[in-house]
């Protein structure tokens, strides 16, 4: 029986890198951005709204549906890989912990997090380097999205950053965070072997000796699907780069992010 684990991380926080590090372990099948949760989520919507299910015994139908979800999840990965461990990557697993836990008890979820100022700076840098495309967020005649500060405000209230941060906030309010293994991107850069050993301990899997100087990218996806922010390419070598978030965002934007997400800075001890 395969063990399925779940990667539910913040955007621009190293989740693709983590997948490809794990992919060095021959025991692991790792996904790019996965749609498996979407299959289950759609099934839940149909199960909830279909009169055919409503008209039958509630407990019997509930039991059947949860078994359907478990069977679908396990059968999907039984078909695509013969490896004993799977790490499925989708940002939604964390906030939908209750749903997942209802048919896959006590799921193990890992979440990459990062200083929000670096996340927003990464978004802004992608915006600036893709000027040959229309970002869809700038309207000069209406003065929308025309400055870094305005773009920070837009990203904080929309996908992917705003939604991810709001979900993270709610996960802490519900206590879901206590069931998740968090890895700070900055810690992974500083001491990758230590962080990976902690992850293996959480997953209850035998540790593997990784090569952090030669990480082959084995997950591939068409980044054009995600627009100018769909950058899922990784560097072959783990190395800590200088923090340029303040120079990219400017002092006002840099300070606004820290104030607006003070709870995050407190929880994860960012300063």
Description of each model-found segment:
Residues 1-5, 154-157, 165, 169-174, ...:
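PAPS-dependent sulfotransferases, especially Golgi type II membrane carbohydrate sulfotransferases
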Residues 1-72, 80, 128, 218, ...:
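PAPS-dependent sulfotransferase catalytic core
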Residues 5, 29, 108-110, 181-183:
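Hydrophobic/aromatic beta-strand patches that form the interior of the parallel beta-sheet core
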Residues 14-28, 100-104, 182-207:
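PAPS/PAP-binding and catalytic site of the sulfotransferase fold
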Residues 16-19, 37-40, 94-96, 117-122, ...:
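Short catalytic/ligand-binding loop motif for oxyanion handling, primarily in non-cytosolic enzymes
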Residues 63-79, 121-202, 253-255, 261-263:
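PAPS-dependent sulfotransferase catalytic domain
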Residues 69-96:
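Glycine-rich phosphate-binding loop used to anchor ATP phosphates in small-molecule kinases
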Residues 89, 100-126:
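Conserved phosphate-donor/acceptor-positioning beta-strand/loop module used by diverse small-molecule
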